[in-house]
Design a protein with these regions (language model features):
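Short, glycine/polar-rich helix-capping loops at beta-to-alpha or helix-loop-helix junctions
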Residues: 50-55, 125-134
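Domain-level signal for Mg2+-assisted phosphodiester chemistry and nucleotide/NA-binding surfaces
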Residues: 1-91, 120
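Conserved phosphate-handling catalytic cores of large alpha/beta enzymes
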Residues: 122, 134-151
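P-loop/Walker A NTP-binding module and the surrounding RecA-like catalytic core of P-loop NTPases
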Residues: 16, 21, 40, 108-112, ...
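N-terminal regulatory modules in eukaryotic regulatory proteins
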Residues: 156-266
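Short gly/pro/ser/thr-enriched loop/turn and capping motifs at secondary-structure boundaries
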Residues: 73-75, 128-132, 147-150
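Acidic beta-strand-to-loop metal/phosphate-binding motif
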Residues: 13, 43, 96-103, 110, ...
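Short, structured coil segments at secondary-structure junctions
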Residues: 61, 117, 135-137
């Protein structure tokens, strides 16, 4: 009897000082799409207001807290402990990937070091996260996209503010299609999605208000779509509209005598 395929084993390390407890449900739902969260640890000083919100949901998600008291101002013991644990877990050889939950660029080198070892890194942080950390991850998910449906008008307004307009996605989608160099311009949407993830680790249709890439592509109105029966959806860039013919102003007839000067007097 063939053995059952094992899900990728993941180590989830959360920086409580730079991640809101509101994302917890969405975070672990997203991680479940990647693999099994075998290790779940959170680092912070749970006596302060920022980290205290996590204390109420630790048991719900089986997260092991690593309490770090702030003995000295300006020194982040939580970050140091997280990095030490990450390296210990990496060298154990037991994990297929790491999920680093933080908006702090201090973890850029950690992410790069883990990937140098041939292990995937999935980052989770706010849209303000510096590009250096986002690009150090194989994939980066904005935590604004993990929040539950807004419960209040204020939450809805905040969510709306974090969304980017659909047209903002057009340039990078066009770039991917161009790079794929299809003879007739048509490319499979699924392949476009994979190439987008390779080109920009933080690309996510949810950032533009859509759960599916296909819905985002339709909304931009910048691509032709082929949904022929029995085949995967394909797209290509709409050809540029031809410029309207230039109107030429009719020439006015020359006035009598204008060309030859004044007529001689009789």
């Amino acid at each position: 009897m063939p053995s059952e395929l094992r899900s990728p084993r993941l180590a989830v390390l959360i920086d409580a000082d730079n991640a809101s407890a509101k994302i917890a449900d969405g975070l672990f739902e997203e991680i479940a799409k990647i693999g099994e969260a075998s290790v779940r640890r959170i680092y912070g000083d749970f006596s302060n207001a920022r980290s205290r919100g996590w204390a109420d949901i630790l048991s719900k998600h089986a997260i092991i807290p690593q309490q770090q008291f702030a003995y000295t101002t300006g020194k982040n013991a939580s970050d140091i402990t997280l990095v030490i644990d990450a390296m210990d877990l990496l060298h154990s050889g037991r994990f297929d990937g790491f999920c680093l939950v933080s908006s702090d660029s201090d973890f850029t080198r950690l992410a790069a070091r883990i990937r140098e070892q041939g292990v995937d890194v999935f980052g989770f942080g706010e849209q303000k996260t510096p590009e250096s950390f986002r690009q150090a991850c194989r994939r980066f998910v904005y935590t604004e996209n993990l929040l539950a449906a807004p419960a209040t008008t204020q939450d809805a307004a905040a969510r709306s503010t974090s969304l980017q307009p659909p047209d903002a996605a057009t340039p990078i989608i066009k770039k991917v299609i161009t790079q794929m160099e299809s003879e007739d311009g048509w490319v499979a949407l699924g392949e476009v999605g994979r190439q987008l993830a390779n080109l920009a680790s933080d690309f996510d249709p949810r950032t533009f208000g859509f759960r599916k890439l296909s819905d985002l592509v339709r909304k931009t109105n910048s691509f032709e779509i082929d949904e022929s029966k029995g085949r995967a959806m394909r797209i290509r860039v709409k050809p540029a509209a031809a410029a309207p013919p230039r109107r030429r102003n009719p020439r006015r007839p020359a006035r009598a005598g204008a060309a030859g000067g004044s007529a001689p007097k009789a």
